[in-house]
């Protein structure tokens, strides 16, 4: 999980989701997991 100021999709399988007011990227590739912090 990378915590970044600006999250974006890295590949086509990445999905942007809003959880508890935070934007999260989930993907089949675990290296693409990101959270806005």
Swiss-Prot record:
It holds the Pfam family Ribosomal_L36. PROSITE patterns: RIBOSOMAL_L36. Signal peptide: none annotated. It is found in: Plastid, Chloroplast. Its main location: plastid. GO terms for molecular function: structural constituent of ribosome. One of its GO terms (biological process) is translation. Keywords: Chloroplast, Plastid, Ribonucleoprotein, Ribosomal protein. It comes from the Eukaryota. One of its GO terms (cellular component) is ribonucleoprotein complex. NCBIfam families: rpmJ_bact. Belongs to the bacterial ribosomal protein bL36 family. This is Large ribosomal subunit protein bL36c. It comes from Oenothera argillicola.
